[in-house]
């Protein structure tokens, strides 16, 4: 039994990939959602099948919906309908044919625009479908039942969902099936002129009609909501009071009137939008002139600011020159106040000496030293610091004597004697006395 369930699950998983290229893309997206990090989609497909089987083993009952159950068209896994049902459907018009009154309304709809007519989804997916799918393109049970109900002219009855044809479809799914059968997947935006006509066609051909009340619907005039309240729109003219019998013609007249009202409102709104655009352009023009004026003022202010900066720099330079000149003058005045002979003594008292006297005294001293004999001259000349005694010269704290291996003891002794001015030689020289 488990083998049969596994086979059904595999068929349910593989059925999407056999429908069309769109089905393959949907399967790939589902597999990527199941395992985003996978690189091999076949492996993830096997994992998905194993996951469903594991849920069933744990006690859960996952409901696997086929494409025919959800969308109402037959896939390759769905069993083809029996020939008895097909023979019963031959009395009704075929699925691809429209009623006799369709060409009259189709002339008003321009080409190149899709309407909300019920179109079988199998026809839209015929390009990417397999050859096996071509056999069942016209066997859409839901659409055939809907068109069978359209053939009957009963207007006061409503047709429900054919639950006997789809026993496993839930109520919420029934709504999705009906919507998918009536409305295409991709409907482009229609113009205002042809929306009412397309709605008329879709409502006239579909089986989902509103129940009509006991009162006459023609007695009610169309209403229009304005700022002041509700207003009833009545037709003016000689045929205002006369109205023809109910039916498709009256409905068509109503829809035409509504479409003309829509076009009139659109035409009335167009000049308003044009006037608004003109006002916006007129308001933009003075703003542009203001910006131009502001830019011109900024350009004029730039050279003024440059001139002000140049003046400030010139004033700073002049101030610096004046400060330098003031310092030079102050230095000159200091030198002028103190003459050359103006000498300050140690006690702090100032005494003025003549420079000529000092020069004469120096000359006299030099002449005296020249005239004296050499002995006296030697006494007058000041002795150097090296020849001065210990009393006059500053005492030396320490003095080093460099001694090498080549230096002898006598040399070291002589160096020490020269430093200390002491004769430390043990050698005593005996000299005879000179005769008198």
Swiss-Prot record:
Q: Where is the composition biased (Polar residues)?
A: 105-116, 344-359
Region Disordered, residue ranges: 95-119, 210-258, 314-405
Q: Which residues carry this modification: Phosphoserine?
A: 129
Q: Which residue intervals are annotated with compositional bias (Basic residues) in the record? A: 329-340, 373-386
Organism's domain of life?
Eukaryota
Which keywords does the record carry? Coiled coil, Phosphoprotein
InterPro entries the UniProt entry points to: Ccdc71/71L (IPR026695)
Q: Which residues form a coiled coil?
A: 264-334
Q: Which Pfam families is this protein grouped with?
A: CCDC71L
Q: What is this protein called?
A: Coiled-coil domain-containing protein 71
The gene for this chain is Ccdc71
């Amino acid at each position: 039994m488990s083998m049969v369930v596994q086979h059904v699950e595999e068929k349910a998983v593989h059925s999407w990939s056999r429908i069309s290229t769109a089905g393959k893309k949907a399967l790939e997206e589902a597999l990527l959602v199941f395992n985003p990090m996978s690189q091999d989609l076949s492996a993830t497909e096997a994992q998905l099948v194993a996951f469903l089987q594991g849920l069933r083993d744990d006690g859960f009952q996952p409901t696997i919906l086929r494409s025919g159950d959800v969308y109402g068209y037959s896939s390759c896994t769905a069993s083809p309908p029996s020939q008895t049902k097909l023979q019963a459907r031959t009395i009704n018009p075929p699925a691809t044919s429209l009623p006799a009154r369709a060409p009259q309304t189709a002339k008003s709809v321009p080409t190149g625009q899709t309407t909300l007519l019920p179109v079988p989804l199998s026809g839209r997916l015929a390009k990417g479908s397999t050859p096996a799918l071509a056999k069942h393109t016209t066997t859409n049970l839901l659409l055939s039942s809907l068109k069978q109900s359209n053939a009957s002219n009963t207007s006061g009855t409503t047709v429900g969902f054919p639950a006997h044809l789809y026993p496993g479809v839930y109520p919420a799914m029934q709504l999705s099936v009906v919507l998918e059968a009536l409305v295409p997947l991709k409907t482009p935006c229609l113009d205002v002129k042809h929306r009412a006509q397309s709605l008329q066609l879709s409502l006239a051909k579909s089986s989902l009609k509103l129940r009509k009340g006991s009162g006459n619907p023609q007695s009610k005039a169309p209403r229009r909501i304005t700022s002041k309240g509700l207003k009833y729109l009545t037709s003016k003219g000689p045929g205002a009071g006369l109205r023809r019998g109910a039916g498709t013609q009256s409905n068509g007249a109503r829809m035409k009137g509504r479409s003309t009202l829509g076009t009139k409102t659109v035409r009335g709104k167009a000049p308003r939008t044009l006037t608004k655009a003109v006002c916006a352009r007129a308001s933009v023009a003075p703003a542009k002139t203001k910006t131009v004026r502001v830019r011109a003022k900024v350009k004029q202010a730039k050279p003024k600011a440059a001139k002000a900066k140049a003046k400030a720099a010139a004033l700073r330079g002049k101030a610096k020159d004046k400060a330098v000149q003031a310092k030079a003058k102050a230095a000159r005045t200091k030198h002028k106040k103190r003459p050359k002979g103006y000498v300050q003594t140690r006690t702090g008292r100032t005494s003025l000496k003549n420079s000529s006297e000092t020069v004469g005294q120096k000359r006299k001293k030099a002449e005296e030293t020249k005239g004296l004999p050499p002995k006296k001259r030697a006494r007058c000349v000041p002795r150097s610091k090296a020849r001065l005694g210990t009393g006059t010269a500053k005492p030396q704290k320490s003095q080093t004597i460099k001694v090498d291996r080549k230096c002898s003891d006598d040399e070291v002794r002589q160096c020490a004697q020269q430093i200390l001015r002491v004769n430390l030689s043990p050698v005593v020289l005996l000299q005879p006395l000179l005769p008198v």
